């Protein structure tokens, strides 16, 4: 479940509950808070997708992360753990403190040339990752992205319908992506 106002209270925006069941009896034997598990899974799927879309190559000149939250932190960590290399990494978030914190985290991970970028500049990277909680599309207009650019739309609603319609789209869960007014659903 997602509760964006939780952040104002200093608690995570998202929460989930996982129940582990005994494979023999089906009875539950563990109840886990699953937000971290979900974040790690989301990051792993994003980085795996980037690897396939990038021709099984773990290098890109530029990476931009749009959104400075937990998912973005996990995505940066996963890129590093998977031995990716970048010449520079750009960070953008509407909240300057979140952007700065993610940039500092990227530097701690050893990523090179980590810098804060405007949205316009962030959209020019070779790999662009959206990981925000935007309620409606704010990146709009045909021709926003160039051919061959990899855009990982981890978020639900950052990208306008016209961009989705002019792009090659790959979905890991079509049913999930085509509901709740997500960018693909709106297209």
Question: Can you describe what each PLM-predicted range is?
Answer:
Residues 83-84, 142-147, 162-165:
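Short, conserved loop/helix-junction motifs that constitute active-site signature segments
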Residues 1-39, 47, 187:
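N-terminal ligand-binding/catalytic initiation module
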Residues 82-106:
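NAD(P)-binding Rossmann-fold cofactor-contacting core
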Residues 110-125, 140-142:
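Short acidic low-complexity segments
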Residues 127, 135-155:
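Rossmann-fold NAD(P) dinucleotide-binding segment
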Residues 136-138, 159-160, 178-179:
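Short glycine-rich, flexible loops that bind phosphorylated cofactors or substrates
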Residues 164-187:
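Adenosine-phosphate binding glycine-rich loop
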Residues 41-62, 70-82:
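Short internal alpha-helix immediately C-terminal to a glycine-rich phosphate-binding loop
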């Amino acid at each position: 479940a997602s509760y964006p106002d939780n952040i104002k209270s200093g608690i995570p925006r998202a929460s989930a509950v996982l129940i582990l069941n005994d494979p023999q009896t089906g009875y539950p034997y563990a109840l886990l808070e699953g937000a971290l598990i979900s974040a790690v899974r989301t990051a792993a799927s994003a980085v795996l997708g980037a690897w396939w879309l990038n021709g099984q190559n773990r290098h890109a000149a530029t990476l931009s992360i749009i959104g400075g939250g937990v998912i973005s932190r996990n995505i940066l960590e996963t890129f590093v753990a998977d031995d990716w290399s970048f010449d520079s990494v750009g960070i953008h978030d509407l909240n300057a403190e979140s952007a700065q914190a993610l940039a500092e985290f990227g530097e701690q991970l050893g990523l090179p040339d980590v810098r804060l970028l405007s949205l316009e500049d962030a959209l020019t990277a070779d790999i662009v990752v959206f990981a925000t909680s935007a309620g409606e599309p704010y990146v709009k207009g045909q021709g926003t992205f160039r051919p061959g650019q990899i855009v990982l739309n981890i978020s639900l609603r950052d990208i306008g319908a016209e961009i989705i319609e002019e792009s090659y789209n790959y979905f890991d869960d079509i049913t999930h992506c085509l509901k709740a007014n997500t960018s693909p659903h709106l297209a």
